Amino acid sequence: IRRVKITRMLFFDLLNEPNMRLGADGLNKLHAELIAIIRRTNPGRTLIIGTPNLGQTWTLGELKFPENEWNIIVQGHYYLPHTFTHQNLEYVPSAMVGHQVEWHGTENEKAPIIRDLDFCQRWSEQSSRPLNIGEYGVCLKADQQSMNRYFSFMQEQFQLRGFSSHIWAYRGLFGLYDLQTKKWNQESIQALTNF
């Protein structure tokens, strides 16, 4: 048996986008069981805990944690407004198939996002738990300029609140990398890093 040294930077993400049928109570119970199992062999390992209902940020308040368990980063996903981020995706009821939806970054477009992220920040501060926006992004059916404005605004808001974040995705419908051309979407990367 070969031993491998595992860095402290390896985090365990317990469940990604837990199924809605599990519900908050079922998810909290499952988290507690998984944490107990993991702590037997990894007492100091940082854990990433997702929120109920497919990882939605509005369900943060439904999470419960085992007593004295603080080495946790809470993760929520954020894809609002859905009509923009998921436009023209046939599998999404709110996708407005056949319509191009732009995001101009107006005060009216920003206000609900700011309200949602303010809620997340209050929860994080009141619970003394760090928050990671584990997924956010825009499908490639959106126009590039709208994507750039959205990415810059979102990154600015996450930084302002001290949230870590991960863009979705590397490839595919939301991807920053084109597998056929083997090129990165430089405009999106600029928007994500130079806000």
Which residue stretches match the model-derived regions?
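Active-site region of glycoside hydrolase catalytic domains
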Residues: I1-E107, I114-C139, L160-H166
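Generic hydrophobic, helix-prone segments enriched in Leu/Val/Ile
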Residues: N53, I113, A191-F195
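Aromatic-rich peripheral "rim/lid" segments of glycoside hydrolase catalytic domains that contact
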Residues: D143-F195
